[in-house]
Amino acid sequence: MTQIKAIIPAGRHALYEKHGYSAAIQSKDLLFVSGQVGSLQNGSPEIDYEKQVELAFENLGNTLEAAGCTFEDIIDVTTFHTDPENQLDLMMKVKNTIFKEPPYSAWTAVGVNWLAGFDFEIKVIARLPSDSN
């Protein structure tokens, strides 16, 4: 059986226990991060879209950090958008403050009808640095 390790950032255990999943799973040198949203500490969505995207990236950063990774270790990104035509420019503005220069990861953006009250979600796959394994 493949050895896996659950990664849950500090202060977020109740959220993941309530819904029965892990923030991320480490399998060998890969980290599979569950969809991160712009949730406030109480789990509710940030109302302002740009702030929601910023908070989703912050939550993603906390999950990566808990596993010993950074944004530079990300190799694949999937983002979900409830209104991509009107949201993509703001999302790209935030994204470009985090992913500033090549090489950029692979990226797929998907338009969806529903995200449980959220308007943006991001999931990634990262390769753990060799000193984190």
Predicted regions and their residues:
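N-terminal presequence-like segments and the immediate start of the first folded domain
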Residues: 1-58, 62-75, 81-133
